[in-house]
C-alpha cells in the first residue's frame, strides 16, 4: 500500500525542525516557515491555514534550503510584514525587524495623544526611513498626521515610495543629516532607526551582517557616528517640547542618552531596552538654540 503524501502541515513541522537545527530560534523558524509556505501557496500568511491539509507546494523546499543558508525569509519572498502590513523589498534594501514595532507603537500613541489634545495635523519625520516601515505605518495608523520620510539609498527610497502609495506618507531620497531645512523648529515628532553597529562588531545574526546593506548597519568605531548626526538633525527639526524616538543597540543603553545629555539641547533623554535592542526617548528643551 502506497504511503500517503505528506501534507503541508507535516512539511512545516519538518522544516521548522531543520531551521532550529541550523541555529535559528524556534519562534523565528516557525514564522519563517509559514512565510515561505504562504509564498509558495500564493496566499497571505493569514490565509495559510486553509492550505495546511493539502499537498506541499513544489517551491516550498527550495525556499527552505535557501533559508538554511541563513538568507532571510523576507529576502527570499521579496517582502516583509510589519505590524500586520506588507512591505515590498528590493535587493540592497534593509529588512525591517520586529523590534522596531515597539518604537513605532510608541510613536503612534504619541501622535494620537497630540490629536486628542487638539493638534490638527501633527508633523512627524522619519530619518533613515529604509523601505518606509515606520513612516508608512504611522500614516496608516494616524491618518490625521503629516508624515515625511527621508532615505539616502536610492533603492530603499524607491521601495519606500512604492510602499507609501495611498497612505499619505511622503518619502524623499536624500541625506538625513540635511533633512527638510524648511521645517526647522516646527516638527512634533522625529523617529529614526539609524545605523548603529560599531565597525568590527560581529554579534548580529548572519541574516543581518551578510544580507543587509552595509550603509544601513555600520556607524564608526563606537557605533555612534550616525546617532550623533541624528541628534543634531532632530534638535534642528523639533519644536520646543518635541520628541525624538531613536532605536539603538542594546550595548548603547548608557552611551546614547549620555551623548544627548551632554549637548544641553534636551530636557529629557533616557533609553530603555526593547526585545533585542534599545530605544531612546528625548524631549527637545525650550532654552538651548538649535545647532547651526
Swiss-Prot record:
Keyword Coiled coil on entry: no
Designated name of the protein: 4-amino-L-phenylalanine/4-methylamino-L-phenylalanine methyltransferase
Pathway info: Antibiotic biosynthesis
Xref: Gene3D superfamilies: DNA helicase RuvA subunit, C-terminal domain, Vaccinia Virus protein VP39
Keywords, ordered alphabetically: Methyltransferase, S-adenosyl-L-methionine, Transferase
PANTHER family, per the entry: HEMK METHYLTRANSFERASE, MTRF1L RELEASE FACTOR GLUTAMINE METHYLTRANSFERASE
Database matches in Pfam families: Methyltransf_25, PrmC_N
Amino acid at each position: 500500500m502506497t504511503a500517503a503524501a505528506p501534507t503541508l502541515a507535516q512539511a512545516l513541522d519538518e522544516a521548522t525542525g531543520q531551521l532550529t537545527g541550523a541555529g535559528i530560534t524556534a519562534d523565528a523558524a516557525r514564522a519563517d516557515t509559514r512565510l515561505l509556505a504562504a509564498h509558495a501557496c500564493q496566499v497571505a500568511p493569514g490565509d495559510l491555514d486553509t492550505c495546511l491539509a493539502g499537498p506541499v507546494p513544489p517551491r516550498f523546499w527550495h525556499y527552505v534550503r535557501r533559508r538554511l543558508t541563513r538568507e532571510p525569509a523576507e529576502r527570499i519572498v521579496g517582502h516583509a510584514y510589519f505590524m500586520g502590513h506588507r512591505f515590498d523589498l528590493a535587493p540592497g534594501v534593509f529588512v525591517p525587524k520586529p523590534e522596531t514595532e515597539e518604537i513605532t507603537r510608541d510613536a503612534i500613541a504619541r501622535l494620537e495623544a497630540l490629536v486628542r489634545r487638539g493638534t490638527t495635523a501633527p508633523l512627524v519625520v522619519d530619518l533613515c526611513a529604509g523601505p518606509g516601515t515606520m513612516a508608512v505605518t504611522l500614516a496608516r495608523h494616524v491618518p490625521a498626521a503629516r508624515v515625511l520620510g527621508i532615505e539616502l539609498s536610492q533603492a530603499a527610497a524607491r521601495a519606500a515610495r512604492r510602499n507609501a502609495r495611498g497612505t499619505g506618507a511622503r518619502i524623499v531620497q536624500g541625506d538625513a543629516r540635511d533633512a527638510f531645512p524648511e521645517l526647522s523648529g516646527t516638527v512634533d515628532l522625529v523617529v529614526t532607526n539609524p545605523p548603529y553597529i560599531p565597525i568590527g562588531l560581529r554579534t548580529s545574526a548572519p541574516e543581518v551582517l551578510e544580507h543587509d546593506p552595509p550603509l544601513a548597519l555600520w556607524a564608526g568605531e563606537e557605533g555612534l557616528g550616525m546617532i550623533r548626526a541624528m541628534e543634531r538633525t532632530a534638535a534642528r527639526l523639533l519644536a520646543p517640547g518635541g520628541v525624538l524616538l531613536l532605536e539603538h543597540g542594546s550595548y548603547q543603553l548608557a552611551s546614547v542618552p549620555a551623548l544627548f545629555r551632554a549637548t544641553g539641547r534636551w530636557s529629557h533623554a533616557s533609553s530603555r531596552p526593547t526585545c533585542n535592542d534599545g530605544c531612546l526617548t528625548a524631549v527637545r528643551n525650550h532654552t538651548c538654540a538649535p545647532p547651526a
